[in-house]
Amino acid sequence: QMCIRDRGSHEFYMGYAVKNGIMATLDMGHFHPTEETYDKISAMLLFTPEILLHVSRPVRWDSDHVVILNDSVQMLAQEIVWADALNKVNIGLDYFDASINRIGAYVIGSRATQKAFLQALLSPIKQLRDYESSGRFFQRLALLEESKSMPWAAVYDYFCLKNNAPAAEDYIATIEQYEKEVTSKR
């Protein structure tokens, strides 16, 4: 499917995409510093069957760089999962940063994104919704706060080990070895 990338007026590109039946791209690096991409997902999905996200860590008005596990990426994953939109959102990661190893940058970004989605998927969504729909906002907020300290990192390490991938920071040595044995000889 054809896609249009947002590099100017978001409203113009969104309208153009909807009018012409093409997928719009939301680029995390191309919005005003006070705007958050995750705030736009649910609204856009009311008018278009799917969207493409360019996930990055914006360096304000400069360029996009390696994705890290920051609030924006966590909220992005949470919005997609909580809106039950995993099958409607296509995700591309930015891993460019000329100052660091590109394989390392790619791995950092991929793992950060996986961790954000894992956190969102492990959230007690049903209970949070039940509290909200019954007007029990204290309970909802308390559970939301408690869910922030769930042991999701242990779950992620287990996921890595089950898939023969290095857990925790063990990937650093693997990338250093690959750099020494392969990429340094190019």
Give names to the regions the model predicted.
Residues M14-L26, H32-R186:
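Histidine-acidic metal/acid-base catalytic patches
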